[in-house]
Structure formats: C-alpha cells, structure tokens
C-alpha cells in the first residue's frame, strides 16, 4: 500500500508517475519531531536505501545529506555524494512488515540514522514543503517493487552498452583513441566503447570539436563502429562564455540560462573557465539544450555521458575577486601564523561549490521564480531529461546510451548513472558492491562504478578483484583521471591472461545479465539485491552486506580485501559453487547451507547458482555484435533432478521495441 502525505506547498518535481490523493490523517509509523520526523528502531532492524551514499547496505549508525555535491573525497565519513536518492526501506527484525519512505523534496534532506541516538531514525527537509510517500508491504522486496512502480519505468540502454567501456581523462587526440582500440584488439581483449573526456572539445566548450586534434570525428566514429566499438563523448553542464560560440550566443539571446537576482546571467567557472548554466527546470531550455546534441548524433555518435551536472562550480567571479584581495593582503606579510596560513588554505578550497554561489542564482519555472538552492537536487536530473527527451527526436525509435553523474529519483527514466570520481582503493571496491543494490532500488538499473578507481594509482591485484565484481554490473567501464597511473587493461601484462579470462566471462554471461536487466526494467524486479530480500526470515542472511543476489538464479561474493586467497561466504540454502578461472576452466561443488571458507586465488571468481536455476552461457566474443546468443551451454543446479528451464530475453538490442512475445524464449530445458 502506498500513502501520500502533503506537507506545506511542495514544489512540483515530477519525480513520480502515479497521481495519488493526499491523506488527511496522521502519518503511520512516523512521529513528528520539530522540523522533521522520527522512527524508533529496534536493535536488529535494518535500514536500506539512500542510493548513492557511503557506508554499508544497512545505513544505520551515520548521518547523511542528500545535497548533490561534486565530492572528490570519497570515503565512509562523507555526508553526501552526487545524487539525491531520498528513499529509505526499513526492515524490522521481528518480521512485522516492511516500510518504505520516499521524501519528494528538491532541496537538501538530512538523515540521522542512529547517529545521535542509537535507536532513532530522524529526517528533516530544508524547508517544510514536500510530499511524503509511505509504502507498506510484508517484505522488503514487495516494498521495493511498489516504489519502482510509483516512480516509473527505468531507462533501457542499447545492448552494446553492456560491453566493456574504456575511458580516461587524457585521451587528447584521435591517435590516442585509435591506439586504445588497436591495443585491445592486439591483446585479444573484448571492447565495445571508448569514452572521450573533455579533450575532444575546442577549449573545453560543449558542442565543439577541436579540429586540430580530432580532424574528422565522424570518420573516427565510423571506423571504430566498423570494428564493433562505439565512441562515447562527454557533455558538461556549463556552456562556455564566448561571444563567438553560436550555442552561447543563442542561449543568451533567448534567455535560456540561469540568472542572478537582478535578471542578468549567472556566471561561474568550470573546465573552460567562465560559463553559463542552462535553466534545465524550464521545458523550453531543456529542449534547446537537447537539440545541441544533434551536431554529434549527425556524426554517428550513439552514446553520451553527462558530467559536472550537480552543477559543479569551480568559482564565481565575485568570490574569486574576494580571494585575490585577501591573498594580496597576505602577500605583504613574510611570516604567516597558523591562522593566516590555514585561513588561506580554507579560502582556496572554499572557492569550489560554495553555498553562497548556489544561493545567488534563480530558475524560472511554471511554479514561479525560485532560488537555485531550494531546488538544487533537480538540476542534474533535469539535464538528463533534456538529453533523453532530445534523443527521442534526434534518433527516433533507437536507443541512445546515456549515463550521468548527478541524479535524483525520477531521472532513472531518462538515463543511467555512474558512481562518480572514486579512488583506487580496496575500500572503494567494497563501497561499489554495497551501493549497487541501493541505487537500483531507486530505479537506476544501468549503473556502475569506475572500475579500478578514477583517482590515485591502482595495482594489478585491485584491477583483477574489481573486475571480478565489475563483470556483473550493467555499466562496466574502466575509467581513470589524468593524474592517475595508466590503467587500460592491456597494460597489466603480468596478470593479462587472468584479465582476458574475466572479460571473456563477462561476454559469455551476457545472455543471462542482459535478460535479468530487461526483466528488472520491464517487470520492476531487482537486478542486484541484498540476501535478506529473498531470505527475510534468516537472521544470518540479514547480517550479510558483501554478497549480493543477481537476478533470479545467481549469488555473487566478491573478494574486496588485498592479499586475500579466499573468503568466508554465507549460504542461506544449498547452492552450487563455481570457482571460475575462465568460461571453460572451473571447479564446481554443491555446498550445504551455512558458512564456508572458500579458497579463491587472484585469477578466480566465485559464483553461486541457486537451486532450481539455470544460467545460459555463450561463447566469448570480441564485442557484443559478435556474440551468438543461440549457441548456448548451460550451468545449472537442479538438486531434485527436475528440469530447471531459464526464461531468456532477446531483442535486437538497438530499437525501442521491447517486451514482444517473440523476445522471450525458454532455454535449458
């Protein structure tokens, strides 16, 4: 059951697709607490949710803010990342039924989940104008399904988007891109996408191409596509301030940019320096921005990643001027005490994403003129919507790849997400594992992290262990920052055979992974989920937060600690374990329910088949276009000797025609 409660006068956010009447009575389960609400937790209650947030599957024991932030310092003590996923799922230990809470509010929401008081969950919005949805059902899985139905269907990418993407901030020329493609081929590694960061642009300006470094982007895209590889360029939120740029001129002339209180365009700096910011909350401005992608789709580009759309702000001219004045005053001193020195450091860091800057510009909406900070979390999702809506016109009937950094619930209908600028660390691998079910509860099925880590230097063992989890995530992208060690998979020659085997395993499992993603999208089912969703009465399953159920029939238990030669795995029921070194080289063993220490060397991955299930397996291929999903073998666990057929989904992978009877077939009988 879903109940809607209206507090104050909510801003129309378009986050849900069902029009529910507002309840007039008290809110069940929750108690008013000043400017927010509280819920008293029992000792072993679990609180899932909040999507892209730090810490474990169970969010108890910390405080969080959904305030979309360009947060490069990932870690368990952060309060907010790039997304506003205001959904909580409370699973009581006594089995009395589960509760979902969705706070439909476009500004900052604060959560205290046992941080101040161990037994108390509390949340509050920045102002008292929001809609509150309460979902109750017997199980967590049912609550999650009802929530997905409330917020609408998830974006479905093209099938080639399930192949490997190679990316780096630092591919500066066409020759760099061609070299990556050539090296993957020469080393026998599959590849479906190469992502371009801002270096392909002229002076880092959106919707431009640096002709000196990329003289014929259309030919490059066509040449790569002939090899089964798509070129996927980045688009940022800011439009460079440049009177000679026709996009900038048109945006100014037609008033499509956000403005300051006095009505003049708001300016802040990002990669190209000073930039304007499209007012994505306006339908006409969204349509205008969306049509700009045409200059790239006309060149044969079929996929994009949107970035910097929190929006990230490096500095505003006003704050930069104040900083220089302060620095000039300090420059007259030849001896800075700790107050002066650390004050200078704080003033430098305070230039970026300053709250004062977010309070200094406005949006013109159907509900009136509104200051940005009051609707801040809508911005990135509305940019996603601008692109998603445009692709319906620019590429009618075709799927266009789109994934973005900043998001809010509702944006999942237009694109996927990646989990931002993580680090090359073992703790970030664990964070990736634990975030996946949470973001997918919020509808973002096409999602994944930067494999091996974006910033800092990765290591060969971290590359392999991260890949051994990443091969199961819908978005599988190896992405690194400009200052990081080069981490294309072919560079790790000492572990290259194992890397090749793991990439081959990803492609071999695509008949299963693609089918399960499509079931999740078309039937509001989970792709990744905690063990407790399927084993709610098992107290040990409720405690597990580093094993995940994957689709109907699999469980994964990644290794996420360095120098480990195995791990302890909890099985809620008997399962068949596969210890895979490659698609054709593996050990299998039926293990009873309970805890098991299982050896797993660096070149191995553990996979578990649940009883009564079958997994279709294809032959590995160089890319998704070459994958043959009709010549299949099957891994199965049928302990009772009965057939365990698999319901497999197959379509053309490129058009928006989904869920026809001919797309489904029964295999493995």
What does each model-found stretch correspond to?
Residues 33, 190-499, 534-535:
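Aromatic- and carboxylate-enriched substrate-binding clefts and catalytic-loop regions
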Residues 82-86, 96-98, 129, 159-161, ...:
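Extracellular structured ligand-interaction cores
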Residues 1-161, 168-169, 174, 181-186, ...:
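Catalytic and substrate-binding clefts that recognize carbohydrates or anionic sugar/phosphate headgroups
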Residues 63-65, 81-84, 178, 286, ...:
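Short, hydrophobic/amphipathic alpha-helical packing segments
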Residues 87, 147, 184, 224, ...:
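A residue-level signal for conserved active-site and pocket-lining positions in enzyme catalytic cores
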Residues 75, 378, 382-400, 407-417, ...:
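Catalytic core of carbohydrate-active enzymes
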């Amino acid at each position: 059951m879903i109940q809607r409660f209206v507090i104050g006068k909510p801003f129309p956010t378009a986050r849900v697709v069902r029009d529910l009447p507002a309840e007039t009575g008290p809110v069940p389960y929750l108690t008013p607490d000043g400017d927010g609400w509280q819920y008293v937790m029992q000792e072993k209650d679990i609180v899932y949710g909040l999507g892209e947030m730090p810490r474990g599957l169970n969010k108890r024991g910390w405080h969080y803010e959904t305030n979309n932030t360009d947060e490069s310092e990932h870690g368990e003590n952060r309060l907010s990342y790039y997304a506003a996923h205001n959904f909580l799922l409370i699973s009581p230990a006594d089995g009395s039924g589960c509760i979902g809470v969705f706070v439909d509010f476009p500004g900052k929401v604060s959560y205290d989940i046992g941080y101040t008081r161990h037994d108390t969950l509390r949340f509050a919005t920045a102002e008292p104008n929001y809609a509150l949805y309460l979902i109750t059902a017997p199980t967590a899985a049912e609550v999650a399904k009802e929530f997905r139905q409330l917020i609408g269907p998830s974006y479905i990418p093209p099938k080639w988007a399930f192949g490997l993407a190679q990316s780096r901030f630092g591919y500066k020329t066409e020759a760099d891109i061609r070299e990556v493609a050539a090296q993957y081929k020469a080393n026998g590694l599959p590849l479906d996408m190469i992502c371009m960061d801002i270096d392909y642009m002229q002076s880092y300006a959106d919707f431009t191409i640096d002709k000196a470094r990329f003289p014929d982007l259309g030919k490059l895209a066509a040449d790569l596509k002939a090899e089964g590889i798509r070129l996927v360029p980045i688009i940022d939120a800011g439009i460079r301030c440049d009177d000679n740029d026709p996009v900038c001129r048109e945006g100014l002339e037609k008033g499509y940019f956000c403005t300051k209180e006095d009505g003049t365009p708001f300016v802040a700096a990002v990669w190209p320096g000073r930039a304007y910011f499209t007012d994505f909350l306006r339908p006409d401005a969204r349509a205008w921005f969306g049509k700009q992608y045409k200059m790239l789709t006309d060149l044969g580009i079929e996929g994009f990643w949107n970035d910097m759309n929190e929006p990230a702000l490096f500095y505003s001219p006003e704050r930069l001027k104040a900083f220089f004045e302060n620095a000039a005053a300090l420059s007259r001193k030849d001896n800075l005490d700790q107050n002066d020195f650390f004050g200078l450091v704080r003033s430098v860091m305070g230039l970026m994403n300053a709250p004062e800057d977010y309070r200094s510009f406005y949006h013109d909406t159907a509900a009136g003129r509104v200051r940005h900070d009051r609707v801040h979390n809508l911005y990135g999702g509305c940019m996603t919507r601008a692109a998603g809506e445009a692709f319906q016109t620019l590429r009618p009937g075709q799927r266009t790849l789109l994934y973005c950094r900043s998001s809010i619930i509702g944006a999942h209908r237009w694109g996927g997400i990646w989990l931002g600028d993580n680090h090359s660390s073992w703790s970030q691998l664990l964070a990736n594992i634990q975030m996946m079910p949470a973001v997918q509860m919020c509808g973002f099925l096409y999602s994944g992290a930067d494999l091996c880590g974006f910033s800092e230097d990765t290591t060969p063992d971290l590359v392999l262990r991260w890949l051994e989890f990443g091969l199961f995530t819908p978005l599988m992208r190896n992405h690194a920052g400009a200052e990081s060690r080069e981490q294309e998979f072919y560079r790790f020659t000492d572990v290259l055979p194992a890397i090749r085997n793991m990439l081959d395993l990803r492609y071999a499992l695509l008949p299963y992974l693609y089918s399960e993603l499509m079931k999740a999208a078309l039937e509001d089912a989970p792709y990744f989920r905690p063990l407790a969703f399927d084993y709610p009465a098992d107290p040990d399953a409720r405690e597990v937060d580093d094993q995940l159920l994957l689709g109907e029939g699999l469980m994964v238990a990644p290794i996420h600690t360095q120098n480990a030669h195995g791990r302890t795995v909890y099985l809620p029921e008997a399962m068949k374990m596969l210890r895979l070194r490659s698609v054709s080289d593996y050990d299998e063993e039926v293990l009873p329910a309970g805890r098991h220490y299982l050896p797993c060397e660096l070149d191995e991955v553990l996979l578990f088949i649940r009883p009564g299930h079958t997994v279709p397996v294809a032959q590995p291929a160089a890319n998704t276009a070459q994958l043959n999903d009709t010549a299949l073998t099957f891994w199965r666990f049928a302990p009772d000797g009965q057939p365990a057929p698999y319901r497999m989904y197959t379509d053309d992978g490129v058009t928006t025609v989904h869920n026809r009877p001919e797309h489904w077939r029964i295999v493995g009988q």
